[in-house]
């Protein structure tokens, strides 16, 4: 969601801040701003609603933004509308601050500060922190560090932030609470950001702050205290992300690029995890993990958005292949209800970023209950979920910039299928299913390449659907969640209203929506449910609904049926295969409608607040 980039150097930091802000755009934002301390020890601040180019234009106009220390922020509105006055940084006399998170008790603090003469110019919770730091600093005459340590004890919520003080222009202070923060290491300069992508042009060396850490940065020194105010040393991590991996290349949008990267992402997901004798192995899982997998009798899967749909698919795999009961729940619901943990249960959390706030809360809450352990599947080795879980498996999908997840979804499914097969072998001591899954997955990268050859057919369908206001997706079995994912993608990217239903539910209500204007996408692979879904197709046809069917080369339909045939006749991999044309469909509908595909309105790539 919101993005932080800050720098302290022997040289002017303005360009570093601007370039960093540009690289944070993919996270989603509606306003932005930056502030520096100049040679006169003045705080110079620029803020703007809308795009970062507005800030760049302001810099060119003022020609005053020169300083060796600065903080910048891209804001996604939570408290207060998307207005200039609510954009960060927020300033209180000598204090300037940027903040990611939500302060839950800000109104109480605000009231007390107003009684002490503080005037608020924004509607945000962040301005409360700035004034509170100033108030405590002047009241107690403490050092900036001691003041901040006092202030955070009075805050309830999440408050990852970076603070600078014009009376102390040689240091930045950063606090990690709730949202991720990392330090970038340079020569005679250091940086703080919420996302390493913002700094990859200037450094590959990073220090990831732990929850509760406070860091003090000068241009040549870094000091870190943990949540207990004890001096600590955090390891330096060298990033292996190549700078060209975060460019669009010859593609118009990141989403299109990432859809087409799926054959290679899946190959990376299975690389070194399938042996020559068709065995599945995860180097991340030690003997303790295998012992845990052997004991589990139930799995609770927790996720949000697209990851939730991946979890829904895997429920079918775990129950059919592993013979383990499985519950899939939205993280934000799981966090705030009383629940019963079944005997010998595993908590399995899915997240693209590994920083999803609701999923983190679910993981932390689960530690109060008697789970055998927690397993996280995500795409970031340095994420909070990986750090706080018992075990983790990386999808190895590569950097995903587009807000709508594509290759993260298919690699999650790939890993989940492998886990289901592995558990089957561990529990039954029979390698047949594991061998079959391993052998089939070897073919998956090539199959996905062939599926992408349907691109022009999908574009033609998108042209037909681009002016439609309502679209229904239906599927059965493990392809019902793929219908859900197809509808979600269309909503996210093209802003077209779409709903997904289990096909058998049509006659229980949704069939009332069907008439000659109703567009219905049907997922109909040649599996054991094909006759059932053909009955659903007949129900729709007799009511005049307009059908668009995705199927294989074996399944026969009436001659006048609009069918897009995919080059896969199997059953096991159909969820992974059939979602790819639905991703393309959402992309092309959005393209034809002229939408901002990589940065859809009101959405963020990494949802780091509840």
From Swiss-Prot:
GO molecular function list: carbohydrate derivative binding; glutamine-fructose-6-phosphate transaminase (isomerizing) activity
Places the protein is found: Cytoplasm
The keyword Cytoplasm belongs to this UniProt entry's keyword annotation: yes
Key words, A-Z: Aminotransferase, Cytoplasm, Glutamine amidotransferase, Repeat, Transferase
The Glutamine amidotransferase type-2 domain, residue ranges: 2-220
One CC-aspect GO term: cytosol
Alphabetized Gene3D superfamilies for the sequence: Glucose-6-phosphate isomerase like protein, domain 1, Glutamine Phosphoribosylpyrophosphate, subunit 1, domain 1
Subunit organization: Homodimer.
Name of the protein in its database record: Glutamine--fructose-6-phosphate aminotransferase [isomerizing]
Organism name: Buchnera aphidicola subsp. Baizongia pistaciae (strain Bp)
């Amino acid at each position: 969601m919101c993005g932080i980039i800050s720098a302290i150097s022997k040289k002017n930091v303005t360009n570093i801040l601007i370039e960093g802000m540009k690289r944070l755009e993919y996270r989603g934002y509606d306003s932005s701003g930056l502030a520096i301390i100049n040679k006169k020890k003045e705080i110079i601040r620029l803020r703007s609603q809308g795009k970062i180019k507005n800030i760049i234009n302001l810099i060119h106009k003022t020609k005053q933004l020169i300083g060796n220390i600065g903080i910048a922020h891209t804001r996604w509105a939570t408290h207060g509308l998307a207005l200039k006055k609510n954009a960060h940084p927020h300033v209180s006399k000598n204090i300037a601050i940027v903040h990611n998170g939500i302060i839950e008790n800000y109104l109480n603090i605000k009231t007390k500060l107003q009684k002490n003469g503080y005037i608020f110019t924004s509607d945000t919770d962040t301005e409360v922190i700035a004034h509170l730091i100033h108030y405590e600093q002047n009241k107690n005459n403490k050092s900036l560090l001691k003041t901040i340590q006092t202030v955070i004890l009075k805050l309830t919520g999440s408050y990852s932030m970076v603070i600078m003080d014009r009376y102390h222009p040689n240091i930045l202070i950063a606090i990690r609470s709730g949202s991720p923060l990392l330090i970038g290491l340079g020569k005679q300069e250091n940086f703080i950001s919420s996302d390493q992508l913002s700094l990859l042009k200037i450094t590959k060396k990073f220090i990831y702050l732990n929850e509760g850490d406070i860091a003090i940065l000068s241009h040549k020194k870094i000091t870190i205290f943990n949540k207990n105010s004890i001096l600590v040393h955090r390891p330096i991590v060298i990033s292996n992300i190549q700078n060209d991996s975060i460019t669009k290349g010859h593609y118009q949008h990141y989403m299109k690029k990432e859809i087409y990267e799926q054959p290679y992402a899946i190959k990376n997901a299975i690389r070194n995890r399938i042996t020559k004798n068709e065995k599945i192995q995860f180097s991340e899982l030690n003997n303790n993990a295998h012992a845990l997998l052997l004991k589990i009798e139930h799995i609770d899967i927790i996720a949000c958005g697209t990851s939730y749909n991946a979890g829904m698919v895997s429920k079918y795999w775990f129950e059919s292949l592993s013979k383990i009961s499985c519950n899939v729940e939205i993280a934000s619901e799981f966090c705030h209800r009383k629940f019963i943990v079944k005997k010998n249960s595993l908590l399995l959390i899915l997240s693209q970023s590994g920083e999803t706030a609701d999923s983190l809360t679910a993981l932390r809450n689960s530690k109060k209950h008697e789970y055998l352990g927690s397993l996280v599947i995500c795409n970031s080795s340095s994420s909070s979920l990986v750090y706080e879980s018992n075990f983790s498996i990386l999808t190895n999908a590569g950097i995903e910039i587009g807000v709508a997840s594509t290759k993260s979804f298919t690699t999650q499914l790939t890993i989940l299928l492998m886990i289901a097969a592995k558990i089957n072998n561990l529990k039954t001591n029979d390698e047949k299913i594991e061998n079959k899954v391993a052998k089939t997955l070897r073919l998956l990268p090539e199959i996905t390449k062939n599926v992408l050859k349907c691109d022009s057919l999908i574009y033609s369908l998108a042209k037909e659907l681009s002016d439609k206001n309502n679209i229904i997706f239906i599927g059965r079995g493990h392809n019902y969640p793929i219908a859900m994912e197809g509808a979600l993608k269309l909503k996210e990217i093209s802003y077209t209203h779409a709903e997904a239903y289990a096909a058998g539910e049509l006659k229980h209500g949704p069939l009332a929506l069907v008439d000659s204007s109703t567009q219905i996408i049907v997922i109909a692979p040649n599996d054991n449910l094909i006759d059932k879904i053909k009955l659903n197709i007949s129900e729709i046809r007799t009511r005049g609904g307009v059908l668009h069917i995705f199927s294989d080369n074996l399944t026969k339909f009436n001659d006048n049926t609009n069918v897009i045939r995919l080059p896969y006749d199997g059953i096991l991999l159909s969820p992974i295969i059939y979602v790819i044309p639905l991703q393309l469909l959402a992309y092309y509908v959005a393209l034809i409608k002229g939408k901002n595909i990589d940065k859809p309105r009101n959405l963020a790539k990494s949802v780091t607040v509840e």
